[in-house]
Amino acid sequence: GVQRHLTLHRFRPGSEPMFPPIFAQYGTYHTASKAPFRRISFNDAMETYGSDKPDLRIDLTVQDATKLLSGCGFGPFEGNVVKAIVVTDFAGTRKQIDGLCAEVEVQSGNKGYWFRYDENGEIVGGIAKFVAPIKDEAVKALGLVPGCFVGLTAGKKLAAQKTAGVFRNKLGAFCPNHMDKEKYKFCWIVDFPMYEI
């Protein structure tokens, strides 16, 4: 009879070498990551990229900032999971930042927050007044360097992760130095839960 189930482990090895040349020849870009593709667990993908379909062309990652910021006095962070995306060499204007945050809210249904660690080593903009009193802790915990932008999301764990994933994608597309737009990068997401809580 016909085999009804094709497990990922059976499918992966034979199929991996087929993808890169097909995408390189017929896709928009002419470069694709070679087999074997990276394996990322569902939980790691959600924690690191905020998505179970991560765009690996973007070099930005999501960090957990709950311990650092949940008690900073900013209402939306209280009692919630807080996620952060640190973007070095960020040159966006206030108007552009507002635009990015608006896009994040439209796409995810949740607000994005932010602050900057400026060239003078000061916390400025967005929710800076809540973060400035813990500047030293923030610099250490998030690995901040002068001239960086920090995008923030908050909510129940899955909502904070997914909103951070949207924010990460928007920031990657906005910052050409953080996204390699001229290639395909493949991965396998493994160990999916049976359902999301």
Where do the language-model regions lie?
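Class II aminoacyl-tRNA synthetase catalytic cores and aaRS-like
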Residues: 1-197
